[in-house]
Amino acid sequence: MTATAQILPNTLEQNSDNISKKPLLGVNVDHVATLRQARGVSYPSPLAAALLCEKAGADGITIHLREDRRHIQDADVYEMAGQLTTRMNLEMAATTEMLEIACRVKPYWVCLVPEKRAELTTEGGLDVAGQLDLLKDYVAKLQAAGIKVSLFIDPEDKQINAAVTCGADAIELHTGSYAEAGLAGDIEKGSVELERIKTAVITAKRIDSKLLVNAGHGLTHDNVNAIAQIDGIYELNIGHALIADALFVGIEQAVIMMKIAMHR
């Protein structure tokens, strides 16, 4: 738990101004499922956690249905689709199986991400430029089913251009390198990575003013504010750090704390 977490007011009413500000906060509850799967039992429930996050002011819920089903399971996706009161953002790889699931569930958002079975977490952005034809067709099929599509990409011009060519409704900029620099205490690299993200937002809006620009990966109370202050960022998706704080303060308070950290 960070120093920030120890001094914040702890009620929704005290923080109503922060709750309603942009960028929006999407909460990833994958690691509630990670804890459940560690014992192969039926608890804790990602759905119950998601509903508490919504109650505390989360603007959306993100879940990643991986091909290896290491945390979120198919049943979680269907449960949430029927009970969330905000927007479901379903992260998934661009496979035939996942397309079929998404078209049945019809989440508000699908965010296409790269996957490697050996990785602990998503290690980088999707190479949209390198598989343009495949992804353009895939995006079109999702949109034909009434689903908005986001592409998780590195903050690079070629990937932004490719995402626009694909017809994506949004991009999510990978903030992992920025976050890792901060954890390593590398202030110079952190500044460089922050500027890359700022430039990417400007580039995206210049190419397509209607394109929504989200960001996420590795964001914590200590590093989120600089990203949240970037003009043009629509939503931040945060999971691991928020769920970690929830172990100490409860999940509703963790959501409130993250909103305050974003807008302090």
Curated annotation (Swiss-Prot):
GO terms for biological process: pyridoxine biosynthetic process. 1-deoxy-D-xylulose 5-phosphate binds at residues 30-31, 66, 71, 121. GO terms for molecular function: pyridoxine 5'-phosphate synthase activity. It is an enzyme of class 2 (transferase). This is Pyridoxine 5'-phosphate synthase. Pathway: Cofactor biosynthesis; pyridoxine 5'-phosphate biosynthesis; pyridoxine 5'-phosphate from D-erythrose 4-phosphate: step 5/5. The record marks 172 as: Transition state stabilizer. Keywords: Cytoplasm, Pyridoxine biosynthesis, Transferase. Its EC number is 2.6.99.2. The gene is pdxJ. One of its GO terms (cellular component) is cytosol.
